[in-house]
């Protein structure tokens, strides 16, 4: 009989951070942890088909298994291309 595990689910916005602790059955997936957290109901801007997820800052799939003590993170989409931002900063500093 599988035991219970405790997992945190995190979602951060510039103005607010959400951190929900959930208890799941061993063998639960990242997606099950997110759904159990209630964040999908709280934040309608989270779309699991678009938002990337991870466990402790490492990319993960929704089907990956979570372990006791894991922190599942839901990432926001990038607003700007990091390469483009670096290029713009380099041009700006070159023009000084």
Swiss-Prot record:
Q: What single Pfam family name could you report for this chain, choosing any that match?
A: Ub-RnfH
Q: What Gene3D superfamilies does the entry give?
A: RnfH-like
| SUPFAM superfamilies assigned | MoaD/ThiS (SSF54285)
Under PANTHER family, the record lists: UPF0125 PROTEIN RATB
**Which family does the record claim for this protein?**
Belongs to the UPF0125 (RnfH) family.
Name it. Protein RnfH
Per the UniProt record, the source organism is: Escherichia coli (strain SMS-3-5 / SECEC)
